[in-house]
C-alpha cells in the first residue's frame, strides 16, 4: 500500500497529464470520500447521489466524456495505481442542483464548467477525477 507522500507524488504526476485533457485528479484518504470531497470543495448541497458505473476503468472513462479525453489518462492511472476496486461516477448534467456549486467563478478544481466527477476506490485511498473546462 502507498503511503501519503507516495500517493501525492503519483497523483501529481497523473494530474499533470490529465490537466492537458481538462481533467483534474485529487487523492482522498477518508473512508467516506464523498463527505471529504464535499468538505474539500465546500459544497453545501449534499443531496447528490453517486451512480455506479461499469467495473471496467477504460469503459467507465470512455462513457464519461469521450474516448479522446480519457484513453491516455486511463493508461497512466492503471500504470501508476493499478485497477481500482470500484468506480463511482456521476454526471453534473444529471444533478442540476449541484451545477451552481461546482461551476462558476470559484468552480471545482479551477474549472468554470464541470461535466463529470468520478471516484476510483483503492484500498486505503480514493482518486477523484473531475472533468470540466473553462471555455
Identify the residue ranges that each predicted region occupies.
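Phenylalanine-focused residue identity feature
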Residues: 8, 28-29, 37-40, 81, ...
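Acidic, proline/glycine-rich low-complexity IDRs
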Residues: 86-135
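Generic structural motif recognizing short loop/turn segments at the entrances and edges of beta-strands
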Residues: 15-21, 36, 83-88, 115, ...
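Generic detector of intrinsically disordered, low-complexity, polar/charged segments
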Residues: 56, 63, 79, 104-107, ...
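Short, mixed-charge low-complexity intrinsically disordered segments
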Residues: 71-88
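N-terminal "domain-start" segment
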Residues: 1-75
Amino acid at each position: 500500500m502507498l503511503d501519503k507522500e507516495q500517493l501525492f507524488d503519483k497523483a501529481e504526476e497523473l494530474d499533470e497529464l490529465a490537466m492537458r485533457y481538462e481533467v483534474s485528479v485529487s487523492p482522498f484518504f477518508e473512508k467516506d470520500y464523498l463527505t471529504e470531497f464535499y468538505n474539500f470543495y465546500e459544497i453545501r448541497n449534499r443531496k447528490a447521489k453517486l451512480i455506479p458505473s461499469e467495473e471496467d476503468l477504460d469503459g467507465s472513462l470512455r462513457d464519461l466524456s469521450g474516448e479522446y479525453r480519457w484513453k491516455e489518462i486511463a493508461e497512466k492511472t492503471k500504470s501508476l495505481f493499478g485497477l481500482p476496486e470500484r468506480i463511482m461516477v456521476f454526471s453534473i448534467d444529471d444533478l442540476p442542483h449541484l451545477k451552481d456549486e461546482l461551476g462558476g467563478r470559484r468552480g471545482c478544481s479551477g474549472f468554470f464548467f464541470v461535466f463529470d466527477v468520478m471516484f476510483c476506490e483503492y484500498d486505503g485511498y480514493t482518486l477523484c477525477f473531475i472533468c470540466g473546462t473553462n471555455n
